[in-house]
A protein has these predicted regions:
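Extracellular, repeat-based ectodomains that mediate carbohydrate processing or recognition
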Residues: 1-192
Length: 192
């Protein structure tokens, strides 16, 4: 990056909150933390995911969204919700990866859809195929084999609850790989 183009607004966020607005159930911090991947075969195609409050007016505190550009970032498609659960459970902290041949995307996130109390956490994912400028998502699926609790009290100064700030995903031509925090063995968990 010797030079950069003019600033472009890809999406306008409603924001799920930061340290001063612990929006997710359990007092968990949740920044939008967008992630972007570039097509390895077409530099004009970029794909972005982030979490945000529900786009339409709702009480849903956090969903995962996707947008793409086919002109190098000058314009972006309208946001599409990636998680398909119908409830108001939290979905946040997405990661994204693209295959080296540029034909597949993987999006994954923390998800509470399996807990009616909106507390226990799982990791879900959704694969997509890319054909030209068209991205087609498949069905979302559970990745974790067991749910896990929120952990509190790790940072008594700024915020007591963190989850997933540094998660990542990568891909090769046959598989997707994802890291996540998993608290199922923790002794400092709580139920809300």
């Amino acid at each position: 990056g010797v030079t950069f183009s003019a600033q472009v607004t890809a999406q306008t966020l409603r924001t799920t909150g930061t340290n001063g607005d612990l929006a997710l159930n359990g007092g968990m911090r949740s920044n939008a933390f967008p992630q972007v991947v570039a097509s390895p075969t077409d530099a004009n195609q970029l794909y972005m995911v982030w979490n945000d409050k529900g786009i339409s007016p709702s009480t849903d505190k956090s969903n995962v969204y996707f947008s793409q550009t086919t002109d190098g970032g000058t314009t972006w498609s309208p946001a599409v919700q990636v998680n398909t659960d119908a409830g108001l459970q939290d979905n946040w902290q997405p990661v994204i990866a693209i295959t080296p041949d540029g034909t597949g995307l993987f999006v994954s996130w923390y998800d509470r859809r399996l807990d009616g109390a909106n507390s226990r956490i799982n990791v879900f994912g959704r694969n997509a195929t890319i054909s030209g400028s068209t991205v087609t998502f498949g069905t979302d699926y559970r990745i974790t084999d067991a749910d896990f609790p929120v952990v509190i009290g790790q940072d008594g100064v700024i915020v007591s609850t963190y989850m997933g700030d540094y998660d990542q995903a990568v891909a090769d031509n046959t598989s997707y790989y994802r890291t996540w925090g998993d608290n199922r063995l923790s002794s400092t968990a709580h139920t809300n």
